[in-house]
Amino acid sequence: MRLKRMHIRYYPPGIFLDYEKGGQLRTKCIDLLNLTPETDVEELVLEIRAAEPLITSSCVEQVKLLICKLQEKVGQKDERKFYLFRALQAHILPLTNVAFNKSGSCFITGSYDRTCKIWDTASGEELHTLEGHRNVVYAIAFNNPYGDKVATGSFDKTCKLWSAETGKCFYTFRGHTAEIVCLAFNPQSTLVATGSMDTTAKLWDVESGEEVSTLAGHFAEIISLCFNTTGDRLVTGSFDHTAILWDVPSGRKVHVLSGHRGEISCVQFNWDCSLIATASLDKSCKVWDAEGGQCLATLLGHNDEVLDVCFNYTGQLIATASADGTSRVFSTDTFQCLCQLEGHKGEISKVCFNAQGSRVLTASVDKTSRVWCVKTGACLQVLEGHSDEIFSCAFNYEGDTIITGSKDNTCRIWH
């Protein structure tokens, strides 16, 4: 094995090692999820050297430099305020979802008008309209980190795969017998998973357009699904009050996560694939051990349905969004509530962290989106201007752009 090159990933912090083995170029990553500005660099380098044979004495100084660069980024102060850059009359009927590509240079909007549109973030220009569905386009996703393909899931029971560059439709995936309401690409961008009101999830091959497997095991609609970062596991959340963990290569059930007393609204993996979070209409969120399937904690405190849940990039924090009009941030170490985000005047349907993990963004039926400080729980900014409820919001990877999607048929870009 011979080390060829090292490069870094900012969020979550990590160092990539490109190396040669048996004449082939390979890559491995050293995750530095606990890195802070206070981390002792010398000590960390010693730990890395002890654990990683590719790191020899000749490259220790470079490793130190890379860690210092990551520390600088992690410790960056984030004082920015967001301003409305563009309000886009995106669709003739209400939007269903919005999503960024990895770099944030483009984003997509799905709509009741049966189309998905691709937009240029910098100019607000429409790049492509993806037409062909015969009903509402409900679930949409880029194949991040690549960003060259888009998948759309529709109430017409099909999923379509498109070129993000040309807007051309590669494949239409047929097989579900009811509406498709959630979908995701695996991290390798070789598979698309779709979840449907027909109680099944399906895996589709991106290259051939063929169905790979049907994941049958739920007794009610599948409303949410998520791949882990290695792509070998998929979790599905259902109205049958359970989540199921699946082995992707075999299509077999690994664990049934049962314990909620109401429908599941959202399921998420953390970055290192060790935890799964489930949000439920039973007013709670549960955290599960992804390996053994045990429930590690029930996160309580909301007095109405929990509608969304997400991890920050390092997997150390969980944010919840509830119909009670509040959001909460919990520690994955202690499972204690660190702060309560209060200020919205109606249910919060969406919550997300910026990549740095310093901010939380929420979308609410009160027609506003809010930016919150994770450390203090203070509301830093109210993004106003939509004339109807906001159901979707997203940060780009750099954390300097926000998109909000509303039932007023518009999408807003905030810089």
From Swiss-Prot:
SUPFAM superfamilies: WD40 repeat-like (SSF50978)
Database matches in Pfam families: WD40
GO-annotated molecular function: ubiquitin-like ligase-substrate adaptor activity
Observed phenotype of the null mutant: Defects are the cause of a phenotype related to primary ciliary dyskinesia (PCD). Embryos have curly tails, pronephric cysts and left-right asymmetry defects.
Any single biological process term in GO: determination of left/right symmetry
Distribution of this protein across tissues and organs: Expressed in organs bearing motile cilia, including the pronephros, otic vesicles and Kupffer's vesicle.
The UniProt record lists the keyword Membrane: no
UniProt key word 4Fe-4S: no
Compartments, as annotated in UniProt: Cytoplasm, Cytoskeleton, Flagellum basal body; Cytoplasm, Cytoskeleton, Flagellum axoneme
GO CC annotation terms, alphabetical: ciliary basal body; cilium; cytoplasm; motile cilium; SCF ubiquitin ligase complex
WD repeats, residue ranges: 90-129, 132-172, 175-214, 217-256, 259-298, 301-340, 343-384, 385-415
Keywords carried by this UniProt record: Cell projection, Cilium, Cytoplasm, Cytoskeleton, Flagellum, Repeat, WD repeat
Role of this protein: Required for axonemal dynein assembly and ciliary motility in ciliated organs, including Kupffer's vesicle, during embryogenesis. Facilitates the onset of robust cilia motility during development.
Family: Belongs to the WD repeat WDR69 family.
Record's protein name: Dynein assembly factor with WD repeat domains 1
Species per Swiss-Prot/TrEMBL record: Danio rerio
Source lineage: Eukaryota, Metazoa, Chordata, Craniata, Vertebrata
Gene that produces this protein: daw1
